[in-house]
């Protein structure tokens, strides 16, 4: 990567709070497999309020109930974790597997989160804030539109165009959506 190339950051999860007293943290993972967030030994914690990003090394991680619990090197107290509450866990897009030149409906989740979702007639539905695996197909969780939250199946019949460069997903809603 050249020095002039801008890094595209991908949010893999969020620090949700402390777990216990010894620096463990509850993490909301946005990866397809919740423990997939542990595939990345280095996390960049982005504070959206301060617009700062801090590189941290993953200490340990494990599944716990429906979520995940992690430790970071150098973060050893509950108070230190509390200071990280709400930060986004990010990695450079270049550190994720390549979805190919035309990912179609096989694009990886990280590429879809943050995309604007628009109906084929131009009606804005919101942005993809999360993905969900259902077994039959993946589901886009879309928020921020006039109709509130929408759950859209990530299938060819619904996703008619995917423009990752412009971060736009065009959809054709099925009856009842």
Curated annotation (Swiss-Prot):
- Name-wise, this protein is Ribosome maturation factor RimM
* Species, as recorded: Magnetococcus marinus (strain ATCC BAA-1437 / JCM 17883 / MC-1)
Family classification? Belongs to the RimM family.
Domain called PRC barrel: residue spans: 104-177
Give the source's domain of life in one word: Bacteria
- List GO terms (cellular component aspect): cytoplasm; ribosome
Q: Pfam families from the entry?
A: PRC_RimM, RimM
Keyword field contains Transmembrane: no
Task: Please give the PANTHER family that the UniProt record associates with this protein.
Answer: RIBOSOME MATURATION FACTOR RIMM (PTHR33692:SF1)
Intracellular or extracellular location(s): Cytoplasm
- What's an example GO BP annotation here? rRNA processing
Sorted alphabetically, the keyword list is: Chaperone, Cytoplasm, Ribosome biogenesis, rRNA processing
Q: What is its main location?
A: cytoplasm
What UniProt notes about the protein's domains is:
The PRC barrel domain binds ribosomal protein uS19.
Q: What function does the entry list?
A: An accessory protein needed during the final step in the assembly of 30S ribosomal subunit, possibly for assembly of the head region. Essential for efficient processing of 16S rRNA. May be needed both before and after RbfA during the maturation of 16S rRNA. It has affinity for free ribosomal 30S subunits but not for 70S ribosomes.
Q: Please give the subunit comment from the record.
A: Binds ribosomal protein uS19.
